[in-house]
Amino acid sequence: MASAAIFSSLRRRRSPSLEAFLAPVDLSGVALVQTLASISSEVVSCFTSVRFSFQRKNARSLIRKIEIFVVLFEFLVDSNWGSTTTRTRARRRSKSSVSESTALLCLKELYLLLYRSKILVDYCAQSSKLWLLLQNPSISGYFHDLNQEISTLLDVLPVNDLGLSDDIREQIELLQRQSRKARLYIDKNDESLRESFYSFLDGFENGKIPSSVDLRMFFVEKLGIRDSKSCRSEIEFLEEQIVNHDGDLEPTGSVINGFVAITRYCRFLLFGFEEDGMEWWIENNPKKPRKGFVAQEIGDTFITVPKDFVCPISLDLMTDPVIISTGQTYDRNSIARWIEEGHCTCPKTGQMLMDSRIVPNRALKNLIVQWCTASGISYESEFTDSPNESFASALPTKAAVEANKATVSILIKYLADGSQAAQTVAAREIRLLAKTGKENRAYIAEAGAIPHLCRLLTSENAIAQENSVTAMLNLSIYEKNKSRIMEEGDCLESIVSVLVSGLTVEAQENAAATLFSLSAVHEYKKRIAIVDQCVEALALLLQNGTPRGKKDAVTALYNLSTHPDNCSRMIEGGGVSSLVGALKNEGVAEEAAGALALLVRQSLGAEAIGKEDSAVAGLMGMMRCGTPRGKENAVAALLELCRSGGAAVAEKVLRAPAIAGLLQTLLFTGTKRARRKAASLARVFQRRENAAMRSGVYGFVGNTNGNRDGGFTTDVSVPISISISVPVL
């Protein structure tokens, strides 16, 4: 028996109830035939007048079969079949209860078939046209399976023992003969359309863009997709299938991705920038600040990749995870390129690389493969065992890339010369395209999108501004695009302007995230910090922003703190004060402590941090309750405060309550680097020869001094490690 469960996985919005898969054990006799009459009548009334885009003949044939069942069930209801009286009469006639039991079992099985028929017909009525077209052979097979099961059931059903009238019995027997003769039917016209759709995919794969005449004939004339709204609905449905796709289904997620790209291209090629209500809102609310334009779209369509599966450098799903000497995992291509560019530190932790060897992380790769299979995502590793499989999976990706390139060309034209509404829609689409894949980010920038997006940053329309700054953020993740953005005249200043006075909260947060992304390049850190109001706005966002805004701000401030020339700007702009205040916030305390540990290495920074009343208490709180990495950052900051902050600041640290106990705990339970920092700080205490502390923690440290590793004496500048990532929106 064909499984009906497949239909529930294909349409997330309308899942069938559990009744679709379980026989009605609690129904018998009169109640059962009444239920069957109700279900069959509902199917006929709901779908008789429906105009099916595809599977017309199969759907109509199934509905006609159900119409005959309606007549059967209504007769059984009218004759009170299954009641005590009718059962007694039947037993007298047949002198056996076998036929009655057989009939009851058949009717219960028919209950399941009717429910599955309803699900299948409803699926054909509600699904997108393109999806039905792609699934045409499979869905035809589902109809044939149902027909075969109906035929088998009618062969078993004891028709002669149901007490039917001659007319109804003749209809049932005719239905039985027709069901036996029925064959799998696949509409030739539908198959021809499906082949045309695949030919468009092949054309893009081979670098040959189909003509607008052919595309219009296919989408508008043949499929009846006549406006932008309908086209967008088709795209959203296909994207939904990528999220929910079962690994057994065809086509694969990567192939569907190619069809999504083609449909998106046709949307703008054939219908321009007609939109379902967005233009009206843009034109009538140009200055109204509103929260969450971008956030409303995030998560509804695209699947969220677990952060442990994302490469910290490329921010894409890792296809070949490898481990470096610091223990961090990166995608092979990304970390290899990082090392080839002359970097000798870990991108995530800042630690020096002991060597350039990389070791495959097979355990993580297996987890990624399992997750991709469960999520219906094609896992395209460049280091698979089968080159042919890798090549086959890459072909549809090429088609998607070419179709997206063609779409980007149209979008940029409207971005340059279109109306305000068209520019806003174009910016939104570019943002979505730049959301995934370095190829998308690369050719969007190469096609010239950045100058036009830069102009939209100063737009007085909230939606346009938010989409443009978010698109800029997504583009900046690609390394080469960072220089394109920084070299574009006034682009950096415009991003800072959005940070300072953006029309939506999300726009301000995404501007901060963009600055964090750009500041990953060392030579840009100083340029960013000296822009008027930049540090001040980041400090304000860290103090008053949303949890996500605080995270964006603290990571940007951390990056700026890594440049020694930015120390004075961090102090003047309130960055130091906001970082000290952030030590109380669990969500950003670790990064704040890391930034302070960097700034405090300079005497100017140490002096400024020492003047903050809550600095020492905040760092000690981090030592007490922070994460292992946060404790490392906190003890490192306190160590540098004692060394560079002057006698008064050192005295404040040494006299802090509970410092002895915290150091002792850290010396035993901290990470290797935290223990080294704690030992160095303890030696600073000893050199101060503070009598009060000598009777406390020094007794402990003095006893361990003779046995500690000599390496502690020189290990006083271990880089600070924090975990940070760029959001892709």
Swiss-Prot record:
Pathway(s) the chain acts in: Protein modification; protein ubiquitination
ARM repeat residue intervals: 438-477, 479-520, 523-562, 564-601
Example of a GO biological process term: defense response to other organism
PROSITE patterns in UniProt: ARM_REPEAT, U_BOX
Gene Ontology MF terms: ubiquitin-protein transferase activity
Classification via SMART domains: ARM, Ubox
InterPro entries xref list: ARM-like, ARM-type_fold, Armadillo, RING-Ubox_PUB, Ubox_domain, Znf_RING/FYVE/PHD
Function: Functions as an E3 ubiquitin ligase.
Name of the protein in its database record: U-box domain-containing protein 17
